[in-house]
């Protein structure tokens, strides 16, 4: 049986790609330094993560819990791949979705003050296999707080899938179960990751420029 695939490690000296090689909205042309992870690579990696999730969690009802807002694109694409596996397998399992919204960033810094500002009744998680889907793990404090909250409802199992994990000295050491990409300590935007609500409409994961930070600063 194949083991879980490790995250794709992007080195600290990875230069990324010139913006001119990709389709970038004109209104962001001066606000980005480089394309860091192209959309096609994100999709291919997400497809493999779906297989890993089904292998580890596919024996019981799964509740997929999306962390809004940044996680919604990764969540939607990951679930599409999981549903395809469900349709084309001899063994399929029921899956439901739920949503929670957290707030921990101001400008480009994680504040460490985690606020739950939205979410449904999490009592539906009791006895279920819960897959928390997040866009990025930075310090890890937000996810540790959310895991403590979810475990109060006695789920059968809790696993975390994060598209990105940042290598940063601010990390508390938390690592998710399923990792798309491990990235350097850069502030990235796109593919629903935002800077003060901007850049969610980019398909690629990009590095924001100092011009972009200044323009959209809260």
UniProtKB/Swiss-Prot annotation:
Changing residue 48 to H: In HRH; AD and DD. SUPFAM superfamilies: PRTase-like (SSF53271). InterPro entries: HGPRT, Hxn_phspho_trans, PRibTrfase_dom, PRTase-like. The modification Phosphothreonine is found at residue 142. Keywords: Acetylation, Cytoplasm, Disease variant, Glycosyltransferase, Gout, Isopeptide bond, Magnesium, Metal-binding, Nucleotide-binding, Phosphoprotein, Purine salvage, Transferase, Ubl conjugation. Changing residue 23 to F: In HRH; Reduces enzymatic activity. Changing residue 188 to A: In HRH and LNS; Asia. The active site is at residue 138. It is found in: Cytoplasm. It holds the Pfam family Pribosyltran. CDD domains: PRTases_typeI. There is a cross-link at residue 115 (Glycyl lysine isopeptide (Lys-Gly) (interchain with G-Cter in SUMO2)). Changing residue 58 to R: In HRH; Toowong. Changing residue 60 to R: In HRH; Reduces enzymatic activity. Mg(2+) binds at residue 194. Changing residue 42 to T: In LNS; Heapey. Changing residue 44 to Y: In LNS; Japan. Changing residue 130 to D: In LNS; Midland/RJK 896. NCBIfam families: HGPRTase. Belongs to the purine/pyrimidine phosphoribosyltransferase family. It is linked to Lesch-Nyhan syndrome: Characterized by complete lack of enzymatic activity that results in hyperuricemia, choreoathetosis, intellectual disability, and compulsive self-mutilation. This is Hypoxanthine-guanine phosphoribosyltransferase. The lineage of its organism: Eukaryota, Metazoa, Chordata, Craniata, Vertebrata.
């Amino acid at each position: 049986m194949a083991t879980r695939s490790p995250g794709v490690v992007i080195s600290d000296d990875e230069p990324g790609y010139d913006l001119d090689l990709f389709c970038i909205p004109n209104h962001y042309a001066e606000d980005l330094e480089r394309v860091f992870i192209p959309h096609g690579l994100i999709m291919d990696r997400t497809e493999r993560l779906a297989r890993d999730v089904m292998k580890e969690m596919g024996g019981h009802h799964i509740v997929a819990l999306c962390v809004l807002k940044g996680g919604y694109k990764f969540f939607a694409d990951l679930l599409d791949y999981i549903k395809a596996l469900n349709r084309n397998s001899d063994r399929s399992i029921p899956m439901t979705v739920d949503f929670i919204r957290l707030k921990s960033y101001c400008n480009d810094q994680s504040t460490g003050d985690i606020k739950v500002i939205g979410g449904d009744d999490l009592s539906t998680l009791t006895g279920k296999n819960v897959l928390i889907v997040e866009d990025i793990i930075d310090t890890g404090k937000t996810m540790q707080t959310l895991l403590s909250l979810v475990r109060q409802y006695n789920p059968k199992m809790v696993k975390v899938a994060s598209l990105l994990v940042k290598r940063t000295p601010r990390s508390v050491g938390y690592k998710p179960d399923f990792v798309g990409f491990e990235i350097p300590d850069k502030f990235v935007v796109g593919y629903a990751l935002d800077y003060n609500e901007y850049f969610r409409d980019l398909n690629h994961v990009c590095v924001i420029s100092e011009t972009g930070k200044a323009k959209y600063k809260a």
